[in-house]
Amino acid sequence: MLTDVEGRAAVKLARKTIESFLSEEKLPEPQELGFELSPVFGEKRGVFVTLTESGLLRGCIGHPFPDSRLEDAIMDSAISAATRDPRFPPVREDELNKIVVEVTILTQPEKINAPAEELPERIEVGKHGLIVKQGYCQGLLLPQVAPEYNMDSIEFLGHTCLKAGLLPDAWLKGAEVSCFEGQIFKEKEPCGEVLEENFSCE
C-alpha cells in the first residue's frame, strides 16, 4: 500500500511526465520533479494511468503485471495513455489544464479457482478489478469501473469479456478469470489536490 504522500507523488509524476513529453518529447529529470520519490517507486508494481476530461475518458493504458519498477511503469503508462490509446487522438499540450490524472496501483492478479457459476459471488464490486483471458484474447477492467457504471458482478464479468473481444458470456464457457485490487489516487480537479478513492464500501 502507498501512503497518501506516495500517492500524490505518483499522480504528480504521471502529470509531469506527460507535460515534459508533450512539450519537449523527453522524460522529466529527477531534479525537475520538485519532490522526492520514496523507495516504493523502485519496486516492481502493476499500474494504470487514466486521463479524463469533463468526466469523460480521454485515455487509459497501463501495466497489468508487476514487470517494471513503479517509477518506470508510471512514466510509460502516462505517455501511453496520453499519446498511444487507439481509442482517442493524442492529447494536445493545450488540453492538459482540462484533464484529470488518475493513477491506480495494482496488486498481483490471481486466477479465481472456482466453477464458472460461482464466479460472480467471488467478485467484490468496487474492490476487485478483472482480467479475462481466452486463447489470444485478453481484457482488463479496473476496480473503479464497476461502481462508476453501476454494474453488478455479472455485468462486470460480461463487460470484461467484451473488452477482451469475447462474447459477454465467455466467462461461463471456459474463459480464465483473474482478479486484482487497486489503490486509486486521483486529482480532484485538473492540476488540483490528489485524493485516494475507495469504492469498496459504496
UniProtKB/Swiss-Prot annotation:
Domain AMMECR1: 5-196
Pfam families: AMMECR1 (PF01871)
Gene3D superfamilies from the UniProt entry: Hypothetical protein ph0010, domain 1, Hypothetical protein ph0010, domain 2
Family annotation (PANTHER family): AMME SYNDROME CANDIDATE GENE 1 PROTEIN, AMMECR1 HOMOLOG
NCBIfam families membership: AmmeMemoSam_A (TIGR04335), PRK00801.1 (NF002000), TIGR00296 family protein (TIGR00296)
Protein name according to UniProt: Protein Mbar_A1807
